[in-house]
């Protein structure tokens, strides 16, 4: 979290890039295998090119997600919020926030902030555990505090429960 006069800047925890590397390595191995089969004149099952293309798209999707995570910033200011993630830049005043939905899950809370013409979402901190050992963390470490500040500054009140989730809106 970075603080400047009148603003608090938050960035999410970053997940390991190991999954991205594995996706690209398996895509490369599939392409190499496909190429070897083609060059040697052997019959290539239709599943091989499908698998190679699927792995390439998987690598691209994971890379895009990691790129966006590394550029994600949420700024809480006196006049409202700013959310950036590399692809989008959203500025929303406190008065323009019409609703905040909170959906608890095994991976932390997913918080969705709705304005008159815009929307963004973020996750509170989540820990990935394997055999009770923390293997990774993602989401905003101060996510619960960010949610509390959004609710207080925007003047929203809890409205009703939606299954396991709940939301805040103006009454």
Locate the predicted segments by residue.
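N-terminal membrane-targeting/pre-transmembrane regions
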Residues: 1-42, 162-171
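Alpha-helical transmembrane segments
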Residues: 29-33, 57-62
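Hydrophobic alpha-helical transmembrane segments
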Residues: 42-55
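Conserved beta-hairpin
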Residues: 60-99
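Hydrophobic residues embedded in beta-strands of well-ordered beta-sheets
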Residues: 81, 107-109, 165-166
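Acidic, Ser/Thr-rich low-complexity segments on the non-lumenal side of membrane proteins
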Residues: 88-123
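A membrane-cytosol interface segment of integral membrane proteins
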Residues: 112-171
